[in-house]
Amino acid sequence: MKPSMRSRLEQLAHRLIEVDALLAEPETAADMDRFRKLSRERAELEPVVEAFNAFLGVEADVATAQEMLSDPDMKAMAEDEIKTGRARIEEMEAALQLLLLPRDPDDGRSLFLEIRAGTGGDESALFSGDLLRMYTRYAETRGWRVEIMSESESELGGYKEVIARIDGDGAYGRLKFESGAHRVQRVPATEAQGRIHTSACTVAVMPEADAMSDIVINPSDLRIDTFRASGAGGQHINKTDSAVRITHVPTGLVVECQDDRSQHRNKDKAMQVLAARLKDKEMRERQSKEAAERKSLIGSGDRSERIRTYNYPQGRVTDHRINLTLYKLQQIMEGDLDELTGALLAEHQAEQLAALGHDL
């Protein structure tokens, strides 16, 4: 183990002792905010320190076995113990490296999913609906709740734009690499000649902002307009001005919500989406800078990047960032995303490990 890595682990072990002492103080129990903060820190430290202590135990066993090599009666057994112990040390060191990776503080959050039809007209809008269904099915398998926040339906079905909230522990951490351009190649239902068309949709995955601390929105920066809600084709479906459009003047971000009959609830939903978009904007700017420094392919924050192709005639899904091709398109469109999301997370961890090795 590198001395710098050992030193870092020793610091964390010492910090766990400090945190336990602080949690035992009456003053901490009286201050709930401080108690919660220290409890969260302890929950993060404990698995790392436990793994490090187990590593030290195996290391000590190997050292003891090495001392036994000079005893002819014990030499064979000692050699076996050393061989087994060194293999375990290698495995445990790799596991400790993963535990030391910096954690995204947003990984445990719920998220907002925004899908927009792009090139391809009606076919693109239909594919937007297919993508929403895919993510909804995936959320259901994980026990997450999906709520439509805003939708603009296409006349032939699907969506010109749809925003959904996916509520569940760890939702953002699992789906955060879905942002980007999704391309579909298939024969549209409206195509009489049987020709394959190519169209695309843009997906944005944004962590839900903590209203209390993440984003401060100055009311004077907002322009709020109300209007009558309309359905597919533009016809008005509500006689009252229940729909809400909020413009954040400094950034030009615009959010519309018209799904609820209550103007107040539409305004609340629009403010939630606006806060998530502002947080997302800050995060993408930071990711773009970090990606340029690290030459990262995953999580660059670039929404225009074509990340995935869904080829229906071949039953193929290809993720271009990691050159992964899976011939299980039907299962994926039914929400079987674990292999894709798992591969992206593994690649991200590999990039983090490379950076950690450089930093240690």
Swiss-Prot record:
User: Does Methyltransferase count among this protein's keywords?
Assistant: no
Recorded GO terms, molecular function?
translation release factor activity, codon specific
N5-methylglutamine occurs at which residues?
Answer: 235
In terms of superkingdom, the source organism counts as: Bacteria
PTM section of the record: Methylated by PrmC. Methylation increases the termination efficiency of RF1.
Which UniProt keyword terms apply here?
Answer: Cytoplasm, Methylation, Protein biosynthesis
Q: Where in the cell is it found?
A: Cytoplasm
Q: Pfam families recorded for this chain? A: PCRF, RF-1
This protein's GO CC annotations? cytoplasm
What the record says about family reads: Belongs to the prokaryotic/mitochondrial release factor family.
HAMAP family per the UniProt record, alphabetical: Rel_fac_1 (MF_00093)
What function does the entry list? Peptide chain release factor 1 directs the termination of translation in response to the peptide chain termination codons UAG and UAA.
- Give the protein's recorded name: Peptide chain release factor 1
